[in-house]
């Protein structure tokens, strides 16, 4: 497969088979992703690969916290609500998604279930958690570098 085919064919996956992913394949994908450029070759990323019982516990905890109304914690700021063309894109893709899933606008339970699926990593058999050393947190470059390696990871997995 050519690189332009990867980029053109990429799409967001929101449902996975439960088949285990071979460790050799995970190592290969991570090895490719780590070829990603970084500011001054800092390579600030760390990968934690979780699956099985550990991932099940993470999913259960995420679901419990969400249902209990515990506020989400984030390492990166989200900022204000989207507006203009960005909001239009956000709403447009949500309409397409919910339509494809057969979830009506008034279906609060269906929408909540969708949110919970996200907190369960859409039931993927493997989750890669990308972190960075906090000594680099003051540099905006770190966020860009982690974004670059995340993009490379997604494309390598494709």
Regions inferred by a protein language model and the residue ranges of each:
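Acidic, surface-exposed loops and disordered segments
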Residues: 1-158
